[in-house]
Amino acid sequence: MTWPENEEENLLYMRTDGEIARSKESSCVLLKKGNYCQLDTYFNSMSTGKWKKYTNVENLLVDVSIKGRGVIRVCFLERVDIKQVLWESEWSGNGELKELPCKISIPDNGMLYLEFEASEDYTEFRNFTFSTNIEKRREIKLSAVICTYKREQDIQRTLTAVIEEIYQNAASPLREKLRIFVSDNGKTLPPSEVPQIQIEKNKNLGGAGGFTRGIMESLKNTEFPATHIVLMDDDAIIRPHILERTWCFLSLLKEKFSQHTIAGALLNQKFPYIQFESGAQWNQGKVKILKNQLDLRKQ
C-alpha cells in the first residue's frame, strides 16, 4: 500500500471519510464506526489486464493490516458502472499483517481493489498487499540511469527518497537489486557516500549523451550485472515504490514478453492528479502525446 505525501494527492491513493495519519515511521487511516476506506484509486488498485496479459500470475493472495474490526471486501471494477464483490468478510486485527482466507483469480481487463468499513470506533486501516506464490520468477537487477545538468536540488530529492525508502528499508525487495548511475553533465555534484549510487562527471552532451554514458557505466559494472536499465529524468519526482513495482512486474513476465520495454506515464508536477501523458506517437518529427489531461482522481 502506498500513501499520499500531501492532502492534495489523497484521491490518487484512497477515498475515505476517515482521517489519514501519515509519517515516515507508520501510516494509517483512523476510522470511526461506519467510516470507510476505499482503494479504487490510481496508486493502490491493480490493473488486472496488464498483469494477466504480460505476467505468469494467475491467482493472488491478499494480506491486510488493521487494528480494530470491520468488513473487508475484495472488489473488481470492470467499468465505472459494473462492480463485483469477489470476497467479503468481517475481519479483526491487532495491527499485524495477516493473510485473508481467500484466493483471487485475476479477472480480465479492469481494476482490482479493496474496500474496508469500520465496525467500531478507533479502528485503524494500516496496510495491505497483493502477492502471489508463483515459483517461476525471473532474476531481475535494475540499474537506474539519471542524466542531470545543474539541478542539484532535484537530483538530491530523488536520491534521498531512494536511500530512505529502499536502501535503508530492510523490507524493500529492491534493496540488493538496484544500482543508480548519475551522469552529471554540469560537473557540480559531489561523489556519493552511498556505495550503490555512482556519480559520473560527464561532458555536457545533452540528454542523449548523458543517458548513453550512464548506460555504458552500468554495462561495464561487473559487480552488478543489471538485467534492465531504467532511464529517469532528473527533474521528475520519482516515488520509490514505482521502482519496486517495476522490478516485481519484470520478475514475473512471461518469456515471450521478456524483451519488451516498459514505458511509464508522466503526471503534471504542479497538479499531480493530472496525467500529462501515458505514451506518445512519433510521426516524421512530430510527437503526439497520448491520454493527456486525464484527471486521475476520478474512478
Regions found by a protein language model. Name each.
Residues 162-200:
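Acidic donor-binding segment of Leloir-type glycosyltransferases
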Residues 223-237:
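Short beta-strand-to-loop acidic/aromatic patch adjacent to the donor-nucleotide binding site
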Residues 1-49:
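Glycan-recognition and processing domains
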Residues 18-21, 36-160, 173:
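N-proximal low-complexity "stem/linker" segments adjacent to membrane-targeting elements
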Residues 151-158, 203-211, 238-242:
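Phosphate/oxyanion-binding active-site loops and adjacent basic polyanion-contact surfaces
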Residues 220, 237-288:
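Conserved donor NDP-sugar-binding/catalytic core segment of glycosyltransferases
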Residues 292-299:
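A recurrent flexible, glycine/aromatic-enriched loop bordering the glycosyltransferase active site
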Residues 192-209, 217:
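Conserved donor nucleotide-binding strand/loop of the catalytic core
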